């Protein structure tokens, strides 16, 4: 169960990073 929780945490972290990169990239695209 500990591994499953850790895996979910890693997936959530990866999704958060991808969302952040897309958000910054979109803002940068519109500004520039």
Curated annotation (Swiss-Prot):
<comment type="function">
    <text>May control the interaction of photosystem II (PSII) cores with the light-harvesting antenna, regulates electron flow through the 2 photosystem reaction centers. PSII is a light-driven water plastoquinone oxidoreductase, using light energy to abstract electrons from H(2)O, generating a proton gradient subsequently used for ATP formation.</text>
</comment>
<keyword id="KW-0934">Plastid</keyword>
<keyword id="KW-0604">Photosystem II</keyword>
<comment type="similarity">
    <text>Belongs to the PsbZ family.</text>
</comment>
<dbReference type="GO" id="GO:0015979">
    <property type="term" value="P:photosynthesis"/>
</dbReference>
<dbReference type="Pfam" id="PF01737">
    <property type="entry name" value="Ycf9"/>
</dbReference>
<keyword id="KW-0812">Transmembrane</keyword>
<keyword id="KW-0602">Photosynthesis</keyword>
<dbReference type="InterPro" id="IPR036512">
    <property type="entry name" value="PSII_PsbZ_sf"/>
</dbReference>
<dbReference type="GO" id="GO:0009539">
    <property type="term" value="C:photosystem II reaction center"/>
</dbReference>
<feature type="transmembrane region" description="Helical">
    <location>
        <begin position="12"/>
        <end position="32"/>
    </location>
</feature>
<comment type="subunit">
    <text>PSII is composed of 1 copy each of membrane proteins PsbA, PsbB, PsbC, PsbD, PsbE, PsbF, PsbH, PsbI, PsbJ, PsbK, PsbL, PsbM, PsbT, PsbY, PsbZ, Psb30/Ycf12, at least 3 peripheral proteins of the oxygen-evolving complex and a large number of cofactors. It forms dimeric complexes.</text>
</comment>
<keyword id="KW-1133">Transmembrane helix</keyword>
<dbReference type="GO" id="GO:0042549">
    <property type="term" value="P:photosystem II stabilization"/>
</dbReference>
<protein>
    <recommendedName>
        <fullName>Photosystem II reaction center protein Z</fullName>
    </recommendedName>
</protein>
<dbReference type="InterPro" id="IPR002644">
    <property type="entry name" value="PSII_PsbZ"/>
</dbReference>
<keyword id="KW-0150">Chloroplast</keyword>
<keyword id="KW-0674">Reaction center</keyword>
<keyword id="KW-0793">Thylakoid</keyword>
<dbReference type="GO" id="GO:0009535">
    <property type="term" value="C:chloroplast thylakoid membrane"/>
</dbReference>
<keyword id="KW-0472">Membrane</keyword>
């Amino acid at each position: 169960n500990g591994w499953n929780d850790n895996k979910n945490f890693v997936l959530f972290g990866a999704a958060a990073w991808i969302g952040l990169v897309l958000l910054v990239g979109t803002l940068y695209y519109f500004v520039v």
